[in-house]
Amino acid sequence: MPNTKFIWFDGKMLPSEQAQVHVLTHALHYGSAVFEGIRAYACADGTSAVFRLEDHCKRLINSAKIMRLEVPFTAEQLVAACIETLKANKLPEGYVRPLSFVGHGEMGVYPGNNPVQT
């Protein structure tokens, strides 16, 4: 699997080495995160087909709601971010893993007003 050069993080496309989280990020200590695993397939005509991308993005948001996390992006924005990430990395096929998590801020079981990062 090739290394990705770019990662979409909190609404911005970043060089992968700049996409970092603080060591006291709530999700690292309490598992306060949700994710999806999405497969993109290369097509014979040179394009990509991403399997049920919109459904995956909606499910990510619904999973976050179950955990009382408010994802700061719409499903449509997440769909665009996944496609943009594949294009930025020049990947006609691959595995996309959107992740939303409670970021750095208050520690303890209840994260209070910590940001939800995606």
Indicate residue ranges for each PLM-predicted region.
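Conserved alpha/beta cores of soluble small-molecule-handling proteins
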Residues: 1-118
